Amino acid sequence: MYEAPFEIHVHGEIPLRSEVVLAQVQEALKPIWVYAGAKSLASAARSLYEEEPGIRFSATDHVLSLCWTVAGDEDFRQAVEDACMALNEIASEGAPLEVSFYDIQFDEDKASSDEESRDDFMMCFIGPTPAAILQVQRDMMVRDVVHMMERHFDAAELDPVVQAIDQLFAGRYESLVLSMQLGKPPKGSGGGPGHGGGRKPRHLH
């Protein structure tokens, strides 16, 4: 019997356009609920873990919230990327979506010194336009860099760092606009896998 090697946790809040209805959300998320072996979004919305809210759509607040774990393999990456492409069409602004892969076959207590877990992490970005996606990428980078450097510098000293990040993203945006005008695919990805050291704790909300 096949045993999925990972528990995959998907986490994020995506603002949606005010006219978006549940049927559109279900269609956009179809790649991941089909991956989970479900026949509808409703039947897949519950997480593997009862303490996690799962997949929720608020028609009042126009927000799609995901705090959801599913058993799976590396091929889930394609499913979530397909879902993100569809969510771009109904998103109202840029938002990040975190996807964490937990190696359920790895036991830290029993592993030898040369064994490593296959835990992994990827960050996806969703937005109605390339500019909206770049904006949320920029905001996250500024937050992370400032948070790290504030341990050693006063906040006022970090203005040149923020300006440098802004210049980098301004250059990327100009390249993107130019490539779209020329009908060429833009350089650089809208997000991808990131690798961190050590096992990350699971999100619990």
Per-segment meaning from a language model:
Residues M1-W33:
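Short, extreme N-terminal segment that most often corresponds to the first beta-strand
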Residues K30-S40, N88-A95:
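A common structural junction motif
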Residues L22, Q26-A28, L41, A45, ...:
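Generic alpha-helix signal with a bias toward terminal, lower-confidence helices
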Residues A44-H205:
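Charged interaction segments
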Residues Q26-V34, C84-A86, S117:
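Generic alpha-helical propensity signal that fires on short helical segments
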Residues E27-Y35, Y102-D109:
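Short, solvent-exposed aromatic-acidic interface loops
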